[in-house]
Each structure stands twice: as structure tokens, then as C-alpha cells.
């Protein structure tokens, strides 16, 4: 079994972390996970897929974004644009050859346009906001409070708001509301259930394992990265 590597990259004055497998392989895929609470639900499957890839001789790196996990940066200070810069910086510093993104990760993967890109189930930013707002409204209702989507969005114009356990600032909310995955020249897009068989674990209440899903992701990434160079 391939041992994990704990890697660092530096952005905006902070040392941020990545989880890596496969060492200095000829192919090195930067994996951008889903954003916010979806990130936590998919992490186990992505790590399993990375181990599988390493067993195939393919290197991979799972980025930890500023404001997430062990980062010392504050999530409320982040925006989609700052995360785009982060992905760009990480890809350069760690010398990756390919970029793979899942769900909302496809909203921040577009700065390294010369690299081959792979996306699984890309989503618009507005869809992510709506899902998180529904969660917040449901939680408020259980607590005996009443708040609307319009009220939350108005609050978000001037101050950070908590959505699904994430404290998001005005810049993040504003950019998410209009964000769509950008078209790229060297792009492969995969649909869940058609191109890759698996369950939408990002919708589950808790993180779950799915070894078959992880293996399917790894097999597709292996074929794709081999076919498009690197």
C-alpha cells in the first residue's frame, strides 16, 4: 500500500498543506475536491482513489484550500478568486501535470489553462448556495427560528454568514452566486452514473466509504491522464 506524503505549498503568506501519493511519478494529478461541506463527505473516497492511482504508478495531490482543514487562514476571508489563485500557485509549486476537479472544485480550476483538465459532476455556484441555505433554514426552523433565503442573502452582502458549518464572507457569496465552470480547451467532463458509476456521496449526511466508486474514479483518471499526455 502506498504511503501518504504530507506536502506544503505557500500562498498569501501561509504554508498550506496537501496530501500526496505516488511520489515523483511522470504523471502527477492535482485533485481539487468539492467545496465546503461536500468536501468532507467526499474526502474518504478521494483518498482511496489516490491510493489506487499510486498503485497504478500515477502520482496525485489532494489540495487543502486556505480556510479549510488545518489551514491557519480564515475561511471568511476567502473568495472564489483567491482560491483560483491558490490552485494556480499550488499547481506551479508542486509541478503537477494534470488537474482533476469534482463538483464545486470545477469553479476554481481554470487558471492553469495549458494543463489537461478533468471534471466530475461540475456544478454552478448558485446551486451550492441554495443547498447550504436550505440546510441553514432547516436548522433555524428546528431551533424555533424563522429566516428566509432573501434575508440570509441580504445579511451576506455586508457580513460573513454561517452556511452548513461554513463562515462565508461577502466576496465568497457574491462570486458563488454567479459562478459557473469555465470552458477550457483541453477538458474532459464526466457525468456520475453515465461515465463513472458511483453514488453522489456529497449529498449524504455523513462521510462514507465507497471502494467501488473510488476504484472507478481512479481507473478513469488513469486512462484519461495517460491519453492526454504527461
Identify the role of each PLM range.
Residues 1-27, 206-215:
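N-terminal cap/lid segment of alpha/beta-hydrolase-fold proteins
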Residues 45, 73-97:
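Alpha/beta-hydrolase active-site loop
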Residues 97-113:
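Glycine-rich nucleophile elbow surrounding the catalytic serine of serine-hydrolase chemistry
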Residues 58-60, 96-97, 115-117:
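Hydrophobic anchor at the start of a short beta-strand
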Residues 112-230:
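The alpha/beta-hydrolase serine catalytic core
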Residues 12-15, 20-64:
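Short, surface-exposed "cap/lid" segments of acyl-processing enzymes
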Residues 63, 100-104, 120-122:
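Short His-Asn-centered micro-motif
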Amino acid at each position: 500500500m502506498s504511503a501518504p506524503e504530507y506536502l506544503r505549498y505557500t500562498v498569501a503568506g501561509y504554508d498550506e498543506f496537501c496530501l500526496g501519493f505516488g511520489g515523483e511519478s511522470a504523471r502527477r494529478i492535482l485533485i481539487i475536491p468539492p467545496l465546503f461541506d461536500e468536501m468532507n463527505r467526499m474526502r474518504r473516497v478521494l483518498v482511496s482513489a489516490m491510493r489506487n492511482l499510486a498503485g497504478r504508478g500515477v502520482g496525485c495531490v489532494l489540495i487543502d484550500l486556505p480556510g479549510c482543514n488545518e489551514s491557519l487562514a480564515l475561511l471568511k476571508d476567502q473568495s472564489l478568486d483567491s482560491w483560483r489563485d491558490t490552485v494556480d500557485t499550488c499547481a506551479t509549486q508542486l509541478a503537477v501535470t494534470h488537474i482533476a476537479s469534482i463538483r464545486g472544485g470545477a469553479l476554481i480550476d481554470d487558471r492553469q489553462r495549458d494543463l489537461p483538465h478533468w471534471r466530475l459532476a461540475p456544478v454552478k455556484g448558485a446551486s451550492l448556495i441554495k443547498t447550504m441555505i436550505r440546510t441553514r433554514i432547516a436548522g433555524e426552523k428546528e431551533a424555533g427560528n424563522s429566516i428566509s433565503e432573501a434575508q440570509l442573502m441580504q445579511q451576506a452582502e455586508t457580513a460573513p454568514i454561517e452556511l452548513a458549518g461554513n463562515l462565508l464572507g461577502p466576496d465568497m457569496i457574491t462570486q458563488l452566486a454567479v459562478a459557473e465552470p469555465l470552458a477550457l480547451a483541453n477538458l474532459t467532463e464526466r457525468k456520475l452514473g453515465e461515465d463513472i458509476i458511483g453514488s453522489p456521496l456529497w449529498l449524504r449526511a455523513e462521510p462514507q466509504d465507497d471502494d467501488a466508486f473510488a476504484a472507478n474514479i481512479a481507473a478513469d483518471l488513469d486512462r484519461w491522464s495517460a491519453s492526454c499526455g504527461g
